[in-house]
Each structure stands twice: as structure tokens, then as C-alpha cells.
């Protein structure tokens, strides 16, 4: 049961970080070719 909770926390943290990174990267310039993403 503990591993399930850890997996859920990892998935939630992954989606939250993905949303934050996407919002920050698309906020200043909306060009599809981002140079700072590497």
C-alpha cells in the first residue's frame, strides 16, 4: 500500500512539474522552437 501511495505522489509531482514548466516556457514566447529546452 505504501508503494501505491509513493507511485501516486510521483505521478502527481510529475504532472505538476510538467504543467509548471509548460506554463513558464509558453508564457514569455510562444514559438514552437524553444532554444532553452535542449
Swiss-Prot record:
Its main location: membrane. It is found in: Cellular thylakoid membrane. Keywords: Membrane, Photosynthesis, Photosystem II, Reaction center, Thylakoid, Transmembrane, Transmembrane helix. SUPFAM superfamilies: Photosystem II reaction center protein I, PsbI (SSF161041). It is a single-pass membrane protein. The keyword Lipid biosynthesis does not apply. It comes from the Bacteria. One of its GO terms (biological process) is photosynthesis. The chain crosses the membrane at residues 6-26. InterPro entries: PSII_PsbI, PSII_PsbI_sf. One of its GO terms (cellular component) is photosystem II reaction center. PANTHER family: PHOTOSYSTEM II REACTION CENTER PROTEIN I. PSII is composed of 1 copy each of membrane proteins PsbA, PsbB, PsbC, PsbD, PsbE, PsbF, PsbH, PsbI, PsbJ, PsbK, PsbL, PsbM, PsbT, PsbX, PsbY, PsbZ, Psb30/Ycf12, peripheral proteins PsbO, CyanoQ (PsbQ), PsbU, PsbV and a large number of cofactors. It forms dimeric complexes. One of the components of the core complex of photosystem II (PSII), required for its stability and/or assembly. PSII is a light-driven water:plastoquinone oxidoreductase that uses light energy to abstract electrons from H(2)O, generating O(2) and a proton gradient subsequently used for ATP formation. It consists of a core antenna complex that captures photons, and an electron transfer chain that converts photonic excitation into a charge separation. Belongs to the PsbI family. This is Photosystem II reaction center protein I. It comes from Rippkaea orientalis (strain PCC 8801 / RF-1). The lineage of its organism: Bacteria, Bacillati, Cyanobacteriota, Cyanophyceae, Oscillatoriophycideae. The gene is psbI.
Amino acid at each position: 500500500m505504501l508503494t501505491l501511495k509513493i507511485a501516486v505522489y510521483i505521478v502527481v509531482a510529475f504532472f505538476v512539474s510538467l504543467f509548471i514548466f509548460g506554463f513558464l516556457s509558453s508564457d514569455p514566447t510562444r514559438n514552437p522552437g524553444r532554444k532553452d529546452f535542449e
